[in-house]
A protein has these predicted regions:
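Conserved, well-structured interaction surfaces
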Residues: 112, 116-123, 134-135
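Residues immediately within or flanking Cys/His clusters that coordinate Zn2+
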Residues: 46, 50-51, 103, 107, ...
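N-terminal module-boundary/linker segments of secreted carbohydrate-active enzymes
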Residues: 32-64
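Boundary at the C-terminal end of the N-terminal hydrophobic targeting segment
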Residues: 25, 29-31
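Primarily the internal scaffold of c-type cytochrome electron-transfer domains
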Residues: 33-37, 60-97, 127-460
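Bacterial N-terminal signal peptides
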Residues: 12-25
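N-terminal catalytic scaffold of extracellular/periplasmic and nuclease hydrolases
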Residues: 53, 88-109, 119-122
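N-terminal secretory signal peptides that target proteins for export/translocation
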Residues: 1-8
Length: 460
């Protein structure tokens, strides 16, 4: 089979509707100013916009001629566009509509990973609420530095200021990483994986206000664990907490994989290192070995195409070619590095043809992992000698639905796990299905209290 495994997270037909509803519902669409929203006076000096970093960390080329510019690579990733993601925006909107009494809590919790700089700034101001939709729609050239930092998503000065304190511990989960405040009269500390000489430290401090520090933790899986371990609270009708759910457990899955024993970190796959020396700055930069590409390839090629198609509506700054390149790199990883599939020699008994399909996870986490809307399935076709289809399970329809999938026909049903597929309307789908407190299927993250199904492939 040429395409036995397919991953989809979204139906194209509904993207335009999401964008329309978000723009119509956003408070910012009314022309409300930053001062009117009460954010103008907040101190934003802890973070800096990525454009200030890109000025020096672009135009980086390997000896073989590969462009590994950090800024150009990063700005076309899901990390750089986490605040622009319309699927995420629609999900937050849905959760706040379902649980209005918890609207502020939901927006702060979701913004902690998707709009982390604006959320941290608001929290440092004494817990000032930082509603997600105060920053939407994203408008390039916005008058407020807080909004610019919100739109900058998971940016340079956010990740590189994360201190090693408590990383990998339960206290760090749900984005509870440590970014230390600026001591009076001191410079902000910016971490990188390399030793720093005094001369370049002085140059960096005088130009940017940041003081470089060696931080090996930035290459460890514990560094990723804070945002990629998410335990959600489930809310009842009045906003009361009625349960907790391990919604995303990428780090714990990695801990129980061969990758942890082999000391293969998250970064080794999602930020593959350059082989050979390369300058890490276009201004007086040293050549360094094993520079990690800031490509952050993952499981979401589709959304990268959405960013290209709706550039103006979503305030996208990455160039079309950059988004296409990142989407292509994501698809290459999905096609070649995620799973191994083998089909046995078919056995015929009368009019019945039987064969085994062996699917093995090749990653260091569940496949698929992360956000529980992701699914992977088998698309199986049996053809006759002339190429005609005798049997097909798992076909993709024009709407993006999977033919025969119960959940695509009725949201209160879902496809069970199969040991044997006998009919075209039986489809092997590896996925999590969330359930509410009454045992009914739900896609609401803060409505869910349990898993009704989780047959995702376990880590290698």
């Amino acid at each position: 089979m040429r395409q036995p495994l397919l991953v989809r997270t979204l139906w194209p037909a509904v993207v335009a509707a999401w964008l329309c509803s978000l723009l119509l519902a956003s408070p910012r669409a009314s022309g409300q100013t930053a001062a009117a929203r009460g954010h103008a006076a907040l101190d934003t000096s802890l973070f800096t916009h990525s454009e200030n970093c890109v000025a020096c960390h672009n135009n980086l080329v390997t000896p073989s001629g590969e462009d590994v510019s950090i800024g150009a690579s990063w700005r076309s990733t899901m990390m750089a566009n986490s605040a622009r993601d319309p699927y995420w925006q629609a999900s937050v909107r849905r959760e706040t509509i379902d649980h209005p009494a918890r609207s502020t809590d939901i927006q702060n919790e979701c913004g902690a990973c998707h709009m982390p700089m604006s959320q941290r700034i608001s929290a440092a101001a004494g817990g000032t609420p930082n509603p997600v939709f105060d920053h939407l729609p994203i408008v390039n050239g916005d008058e407020s530095e807080l909004h610019r930092l919100a739109a900058d998503s998971i940016s340079c000065s956010l990740c590189h200021q994360i201190a090693p304190d408590r990383l990998g511990s339960p206290e760090s989960y749900n984005s509870q990483f440590v970014v230390k405040p600026i001591p009076p009269g001191a410079s902000r500390i910016i971490y990188g994986p390399y030793q720093v000489d005094a001369g370049r430290k002085t140059i960096m401090r005088s130009v940017t206000g940041y003081e470089q520090a060696e931080g090996p933790h930035i290459r460890e899986s514990t560094f990723c664990a804070s945002c990629h371990t998410l335990i959600t609270e489930a809310f009842g009708p009045g906003g009361e907490v009625i349960g907790r759910l391990p919604e995303q457990m990428n780090y714990q899955e990695w801990q129980h994989s061969a990758f942890e024993k082999e000391q293969r970190s998250c970064q080794s796959c999602h930020m593959p290192a350059v082989s050979g020396p390369v300058r890490i700055s276009s201004v007086l930069g040293d050549e360094r070995d094993t520079l990690n590409r800031h490509v952050f390839v993952g499981g979401n090629a589709f959304m990268l195409h959405v960013f290209n198609r709706y550039r103006a509506e979503l305030g996208v700054t990455a160039l079309p070619a950059e988004l296409d390149a990142t989407a292509s790199a994501t698809m290459r990883q999905l096609e070649h590095d995620t799973a191994r599939l083998a089909v046995s020699v078919p056995e015929r008994t009368g009019e019945t043809l039987a064969f085994d399909v062996d699917v093995r996870n090749a990653t260091g986490h569940k496949f698929p992992t992360g956000y529980p809307a992701r699914r992977t399935w088998l698309h199986v076709i049996v053809r006759d000698a002339a190429g005609g289809a005798l049997f097909e399970s798992g076909a993709v329809e024009a709407t993006g639905a999977i033919a025969g999938n119960d959940a695509d026909l009725d949201p209160l049903r879902f496809e069970p796990h199969y040991q044997t597929i006998r009919r075209p309307d039986e489809v092997q789908i590896y996925e999590p299905i969330l359930g509410d407190s009454k045992g009914a299927p739900t896609t609401g993250l803060v409505t869910a209290t349990q898993y009704l199904k989780d047959n995702r492939l376990l880590p290698r």
